[in-house]
Regions:
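Short alpha-helical DNA-recognition segment
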Residues: 29-47
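DNA major-groove recognition helix of helix-turn-helix/homeodomain DNA-binding modules
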Residues: 57-77
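A conserved structural/catalytic subdomain of Rossmann-like adenosyl-cofactor enzymes
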Residues: 372-610
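Non-catalytic, mostly N-terminal accessory regions of nucleic-acid modification and defense proteins
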Residues: 80-290, 294, 356-367, 474-477, ...
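Conserved S-adenosyl-L-methionine
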Residues: 272-383, 388-390, 394-399, 405, ...
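A short, Lys/Arg-rich alpha-helix, primarily the initiator
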Residues: 2-27, 184, 202
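The alpha-helix within a helix-turn-helix
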Residues: 25, 36, 65
Length: 610
């Protein structure tokens, strides 16, 4: 899917750039030839720009940007049409990241790549942005010396202050730095580690975010990653076409980079790597369905790299327009795995989003609590917990200090904590809160139709009887990297609209996919179709059905699986049995006649037919 999306974005950017060049010529009165001379390019190049046939490289694109800036008032609006084209496109990003990953692939397993690539990518981004901010201060104070003097006195003038020895030119060896008191690093790994720790020291919000990896670490006397491998990584990121400054990449560049690498790690490492990755299309679908409002608090108890939270914020910005968003979302997440926790923190910093990511086991030790020690409650919860988690002691549910389980249908079985996560999510919602939870398909039906007692069905019954389930969406097979199973999105709403009370919206989206390698993916049109259908709540044949909670209880034994109610295939027409028997008799009669004719033929030939 990423390749398809990048192509669309690339084409859209070409058209926007084309309009900008045409408008520039119109306002200046320049001919194509004259503009080409002004910019130092050929007449053919300008002509191709205007036809949307050619996108300039980053160097030329920056030159166009600077030319428009020099024109002054009356031309500033053209910069908005140019900015997207100056930025690295998704395909360029993917190429850069995978080349970097491959450059050290022989030294580290795929799941370990991120421990080294992402912090380096982050420091490159910080350094390039810092350079841009220095340039801004130079314009304001007249020269670089004055600008740096002012900055040394007030670090708050920039987003993040980067000490000289931690800047990318010094790390990459392109600029010399004179270390004092014999503090010259002995290895490149030590140099990088020191730089990351120094940046974190100067910028407290980055503590525990970028300074958690030791690039100089050893195991059994050998370096975990050699200086040669680190140098190869640095050289890949030092390509001038891969600059990561303020206007070089889109705001969510690092978020996209994290997702891309996580996806590639999952592809390379097999199912074991899939646990930290939710397919980005599923995340976008959830964001579109939740449609968060300005100022709302959103929580992910299993936040991973923070992708679901970030997508909610980006969906808000895309829907309302960045300039109209006066109250950003407040994002909260908890994550157990150290590396994913650090990436989630990076994601928040990079996106300049208001939020808090804490580390710990949410099920046994939920960190977000109110002043009285109870669970903090949120407007929206989005999450993709581990499916069928079977390592929770059953006694834990009974002794839970937050009483998340006994009052919400009972205790989940030892074999699967799916509904325990749903119970935690419900306990974390405000009185009018909503939630989207990605679960194993079996969570919708296990225990239904059986005469014996089933703990999951009992909990499911509680949620249905209390009219808390607003919808269930069945996803296509083979989307997730840790399983080929389809998965569902369970939608909880504590405050359903009057027309939806007592009903559940079921969507069978199992056919809404494109084949991919190695996994299937949801198309952009599928995302729009599914989200629009759910939000409208109008029945669609073979796709969306509205079922009453009463019918689900009385006729379906609390089975809420969309596939039980919606068949996507063509209906098979069955013929009347008597007609079938009549046809069989006719065939047998014809067969008997044919046999008699054959007997006569063989007798004339001297053969006896027995």
């Amino acid at each position: 899917m990423i390749y398809n999306v990048s192509y669309v974005i690339f084409k859209e950017n070409l058209m926007e750039f084309s309009k900008t060049i045409k408008e520039l010529r119109k306002r200046t009165g320049l001919t194509q030839q004259k503009l080409a001379e002004e910019l130092g390019v050929s007449l053919l190049t300008v002509a191709r720009w205007e036809k949307g046939q050619f996108k300039p490289n980053p160097t030329i694109s920056r030159m166009v940007w600077e030319y428009i800036e020099k024109l002054g008032k009356g031309y500033e609006d053209l910069l908005s049409g140019l900015s997207n084209n100056e930025q690295m496109n998704i395909k360029d990003m993917e190429t850069m990241l995978w080349q970097a990953a491959c450059s050290i692939r022989g030294e580290k397993d795929a799941p370990k790549f991120k421990d080294y690539i992402l912090p380096l990518l982050f420091i490159k981004r910080l350094s390039d942005v810092f350079e841009d901010e220095i340039a801004r201060l130079v314009k304001e104070y007249g020269d670089e010396k004055s600008a740096r003097k002012v900055l040394e006195a007030d670090h708050s003038l920039v987003r993040f202050y980067i000490p000289e020895e931690a800047t990318w030119p010094v790390l990459s060896g392109r600029k010399e730095f004179k270390y004092t008191d014999n503090k010259t690093p002995k290895t490149l790994g030590e140099k990088i580690t020191n730089a990351l720790r120094l940046i974190a020291k100067e910028n407290p919000s980055l503590n525990g975010v970028i300074d958690t990896v030791d690039f100089n670490a050893t195991h059994n006397g050998e370096r975990e990653i050699s200086d040669d491998a680190l140098n190869r990584l640095i050289e890949k990121f030092s390509n001038p076409d891969y600059r990561l400054g303020i206007n070089d990449v889109e705001p969510d560049f690092l978020g996209r980079a994290y997702e891309y690498l996580l996806r590639k790690f999952a592809e390379s490492s097999g199912q074991s790597a899939g646990e930290f990755f939710t397919p980005q299309e599923v995340g976008w679908l959830i964001a579109k369905i939740m449609s968060p409002k300005q100022g709302e608090e959103i929580y992910d108890p299993c936040s991973g790299s923070g992708g679901l939270l970030v997508k909610c914020q980006l969906e808000l910005l895309a829907r309302d327009g960045k300039e109209k968003v006066k109250k950003p979302l407040k994002l909260y997440g908890q994550e157990l795995t150290g590396s994913s926790f650090a990436i989630a923190r990076m994601n928040m910093v990079v996106h300049d989003m208001e939020g808090e990511i804490l580390r710990g086991n949410t099920m046994t030790n939920p960190k977000f609590q109110d002043q009285s020690g109870g669970l903090k409650q949120f407007d929206i919860v989005v999450t993709n917990p581990m499916w069928n988690q079977d390592n929770i002691d059953p006694d834990f549910y009974e002794n839970d200090p937050h009483e998340r389980f006994s009052s919400r249908g009972g205790y989940a079985p030892a074999s699967s904590a799916d509904w325990a996560w749903v119970q935690h999510v419900h306990a974390s919602l405000k009185p009018k809160g909503r939630a989207a939870i990605v679960l194993d398909t079996g969570a919708a039906s296990r225990g239904s139709g059986s005469q014996s007692e089933n703990k999951e069905k009992t909990i499911r019954k509680w949620f249905v009887d209390n009219d808390l389930i607003e919808g269930v969406i069945l996803l296509p097979d083979n989307l997730f990297y840790n399983t080929t199973a389809a998965g569902i999105i369970l939608l909880i709403n504590k405050n359903k609209s009057p027309e939806r009370k007592g009903k559940i919206i079921l969507i069978n989206a199992s056919d809404e996919f494109e084949k991919g390698r190695p996994k299937n993916y949801l198309t952009e049109s599928a995302l729009k179709k599914i989200s629009a259908a759910f939000n409208s709540g109008v029945e669609i044949k073979k796709f969306l059905k509205i079922v009453s909670c009463k019918e689900i209880a009385e006729k379906h034994d609390y089975n809420i699986s969309p596939s039980r109610f919606i068949e996507t295939g063509e209906a098979v027409e069955h013929r009347d049995i008597q007609l079938i028997l009549d046809d069989i008799a006719k065939i047998e009669k014809e067969q008997s006649k044919n046999e008699q004719d054959l007997k006569k033929i063989f007798l004339r030939l001297g053969y006896k037919w027995n």
